[in-house]
Amino acid sequence: MMGVTTTLNEDTEPSIPPGFGPFATLPLWGIHNDAKPAVTHSTPVQALQSIRKDSEECQPSAAVSRSDTPCSTSGTQTCRKSLRNRPPIDYSRFEHISDEDSDVEIVEKDVSSTRRRQQLPKGVLRGCAECSDCQKVIAKWNPAGARRPVLDEAPVFYPTEEEFEDTLKYIESIRPMAEPYGICRIVPPSSWKPPCLLKDKSIWEGSKFSTRVQKVDKLQNRKSSKKGRRGGMMKRRKLAESEENSATAHTQTGMQQSPERFGFEPGPEFTLQTFQKYADDFSKQYFRKDTSMDSVPSVEDIEGEYWRIVEVPTEEIEVIYGADLETGTFGSGFPKLSPETKSDAEDKYAQSGWNLNNLPRLQGSVLSFEGGDISGVLVPWVYVGMCFSSFCWHVEDHHLYSLNYMHWGAPKLWYGVPGKDAVNLESAMRKHLPELFEEQPDLLHNLVTQFSPSLLKSEGVHVYRCVQHEGEFVLTFPRAYHAGFNCGFNCAEAVNVAPIDWLPIGHNAVELYREQARKITISHDKLLLGAAREAIRAQWDILFLKRNTADNMRWKSICGADSTIFKALKARIETELVQRKTLGVPAQSRKMDAEFDSIDRECALCYYDLHLSASGCPCCPEKYACLVHAKQLCSCDWDKRFFLFRYDVNELNILADALGGKLSAIHRWGVSDLGLSLSSCVKREKVQDSKTVRRLTDGPRRSYMSQASAVSLVSSSTSNEQKDEGNKIMKIASPQTNNVCPSVEQRKSENISPLKEPCVRNELSCTTNSDSNGLQYNGGLGGHKGSAPGLPVSSSPSFSSNVATRPISTSSVSMKIVQGLVASKSCIQASSRTGDSRSLLGEHHNRSPAMIHDGTNMKSSLESSNNSCRLIASDYNATPCHSSKDQVLVTPGTNASVVTLKDSSQVHSASSQQFVRTGPWTQSASHEASSPSTSALKPSLDPPAMKNLYGGFTQGSAHPGPPSFSNQQPNDGRLQRTSESLPGVEARARGHPTVTAQPALEIHSRNGGAQKGPRIANVVHRFKCSVEPLEIGVVLSGRLWSSSQAIFPKGFRSRVKYFSIVDPIQMAYYISEILDAGMQGPLFMVKLENCPGEVFINLSPTKCWNMVRERLNMEIRRQLNMGKSNLPTLQPPGSVDGLEMFGLLSPPIVQAIWARDRDHICTEYWRSRPHVLIEDPNNRHMLSQGPPLLALRGLIQRANRDELQVLRSLMTNSNNLDDSSRQQAAHIIEEEIAKQLC
């Protein structure tokens, strides 16, 4: 021990290590006979391993000797020298190993890493007494210690001008090549140079932004700290939410403000001008090798120095980063569409799909179905960086795509890991940073931890490098981890996008979030269902309206049973059904209100999205849970729990079938859920009627199932509390409409939010359970419930019902007047064979009928004991049915009628192919006085007379012009109550009596009830119209372009005045137009002149105007419910004739159309008028073609060009035909006739 005299200041090494003095005379390898000398180590690695083992064994001895030996307190350098002073080891063999690569150094850092990290000297001194945005850089670039990772490069793509036009299509095209890398670079065409608005002087010098202070040396190597500052990730949130709500959400999962977490402290505010000065000053000071010259490092030099600082720091390096700057406040670098657009170039870039302000909501991105502006997801973020400012390893929220564009500046280095290696990256980081993950299990969600790509690569994780330059895009793929840093001052902008292929990945993301109890950013179910509904809408437009637009074709191309969206929807439905089945049969199930998730609704336990379903309890009205955690919501009895479902099981199945391309499902979903506002379902119902072909269509009308009444999935008894809730929900089922005309004030009801699209139909939803014979209807009229135990229910029920218009064809009909519209059992069974019929339940005081509709059967839930009929609602006019088959309709001119079982049987015996438009069943005043409550009227009408009664024209009609009414006031446009109408006159001319109906409301009033609600005329009057032709159009051949009544010229336009559907008190002009629907023939369109948003389209002119009439009646009812007076009476069926309203029966217009068809190419029309005289310009009269010539014309139309030329040569030159040739031609014709007879 006396030989140990080394002090802290001695430079010479001691002859023997401290503490080994007494054993100095003994060789180390002589202690055991079987020991080998240390010099036998064959490699430096083996020697280093021996040193590491010896150093661990020496630690206790060194601790004991520290109090006795001055050397033990010397620092790491002295300890290192003592460890190297071992006679058996030749240390000269390791002198060539640098300090950075030495394993000895690594061992020493492991021993005293905490002390060394705490003792790192300051490399950057930021701020002073006078300002906070100045700096002094003490640390210097160390090229010798560079630790640049050896990685493969991510792919780079150079789209052409044509490829660059469609953003999502191009991303889809490169996905198979780029997704295996997780990241790629896209270099736009050289001509694409958008202006950067952030360089405007007002923003450059005047707009300040907040920054973060990043300690680069602690991004990877730091101790698990119990004290820290806020986290580095800002939670994506909606811009529209209030500051209070924003702050709350921000505290919960946004900027991690917990004092137990490591994070980035806030830095000073900068403008772009001052930040550039600060960033350039840092780079200049840090990379200056000496005072005599400046050095400009390459990207590779900066990369090597960055990872040296992260992995083996020697000084504390602080940098500033302006990250996550909301473009909504700071501004975007891309131009936006506005009236202030200065040039065509700006307008071009403002509309570009590569403009990050447009990208998330492009057609084909499911983010377009998110209504709110979510900062960072749908609203881009701006990033202003300097050298070494970093973005740490992370994936995008919900595993979305992200697109980053660099506006200007130094390169940005990216590192990407493909989605298939995401789990491997997480495992590798947990393995090497266990303390950090123990403290923060969600460490990777906070963007505060960097990790060496070299270490990831050594763990088998695929990592790729990408260098982004000014004017280039970087695209990251779903669940692809990425990180990086900036090489100097630059500015970039980024946003998310979600093509259809993201949907299954997004579903996995939200399920993962549920497991992690992590807050969501977007509603995945809302996006999925929104995309599915839009895809079905596109298929509707293509299949029924022949609108083969680019957008529609894009959506159609992604549909089908093998499509991604179909599989994603099926997977989500299966998950939902499993969860519902797990719950068993819920005691109380309700229809989810449309606005339920207008505010963010999340599971109180796992934060799962509640767009599709939710569970709740009366004890906590503002607290809901997902179906998985329904039992954990509260401690109340299970019977008190209620469940909200946006769609029932059958509706979800119909949605899936429609998305898969099933035509009937597309039709059902389009009618019931979409309610297309600008068109009707263009379907053809061809009905033969004495050589007349009529085309009928189903007209979809705006409806919102989400505004329906409460739904019970099974038959069960409910508590009074449930009944009160049903009554409360029922209030939302009152008739409502909405006008999209900007000049019209949007109407709102107390319990109904305004509809987002034009509405021409209202409905109640009534859902059945195919597993039960009973049915429960929550919230009948007036809030009452009706039950129908024992009624058979179809296995494929529909999810809404509307009063349907069904044509009736019969030679004898028995009508009775009762309170309410009553349909017989037989009539209902007849209608059940028509397919997808609908019903609309209307409110009426003191009555609460309920009706169910199962898609094939329509049955009421209340029995009428007196008449053996089933009662359904009565207060609404009938509306067009939705079926491709022939329907049966009883449409009285009043709100009340009944068809007995016996009478209805006669309906079935009538021809199902005959269509008769709704007509004016009327009753005289004297007769109604004698029968105040019920009267049996049996008019004997044959089918031809009945057709004429309903507004048709007979074959013998010599003049197609409209009739006039002497009892109507001129030009007032209102219906007047007169003793007879046109149908009555026509019926009397044929010897049939006129039947007048008594309104149910008046009967109810006479019986003591209060007379409320809209009035309907006792006598149906044809509306007297004066049509102004705007354009005659062009006549086309083909049977679809004419009928026995009128010719339908393509491009025909006319103008007529009728009650305004916006304000029924006023009259308004309507524009009627005939369009070309291709194979479907003519398409009839009517629109309100001063409100282009109100458009009605159908393949039948009469049904087209009937849609206008029904829309008018709905508005009258709505305004009447609001207490308005001086409203016109409800317009009954038959009050308007589509052909007349179009002007196609007006004599002047008819003459003009005839002039366009001098060759009589409209054969359907002229076949019924073989002797009509047409005046030519030379005042000569030409006789119309007779049947032989018409037959010849049909033959000629089927001939090809060569055959027509030969025929013309034969007919014009008599010399070509002698008697022999004529005989041969006749013989050939006779042979062909004989063949056809055989």
Curated annotation (Swiss-Prot):
Domain FYR N-terminal residues, every copy: 1019-1077
Q: Keywords in alphabetical order, please.
A: Chromatin regulator, Dioxygenase, Iron, Metal-binding, Nucleus, Oxidoreductase, Transcription, Transcription regulation
Tell me the segments the record calls region Disordered: 56-79, 215-266, 699-725, 777-798, 834-863, 910-978
> Where along the chain is composition biased (Polar residues)?
62-79, 245-259, 910-923, 964-978
Q: Please name the taxonomic classification of the source.
A: Eukaryota, Viridiplantae, Streptophyta, Embryophyta, Tracheophyta
Q: Which cofactor does it need?
A: Fe(2+)
Pfam families, per the entry:
FYRC, FYRN, JmjC, JmjN, zf-C5HC2
What protein am I looking at?
Lysine-specific demethylase JMJ703
Q: What does this protein do?
A: Histone demethylase that demethylates 'Lys-4' (H3K4me) of histone H3 with a specific activity for H3K4me3, H3K4me2 and H3K4me1. No activity on H3K9me3/2/1, H3K27me3/2/1 and H3K36me3/2/1. Involved in the control of stem elongation by regulating methylation states of H3K4me3 on cytokinin oxidase (CKX) gene family, which may cause increased expression of CKX genes and reduced cytokinin levels. Prevents ectopic retrotransposition by regulating the levels of H3K4me3 in two non-LTR retrotransposons KARMA and LINE-1 (L1) and reinforcing their repressed states.
* Effect annotated for changing W381A: Loss of activity on H3K4me3/2/1
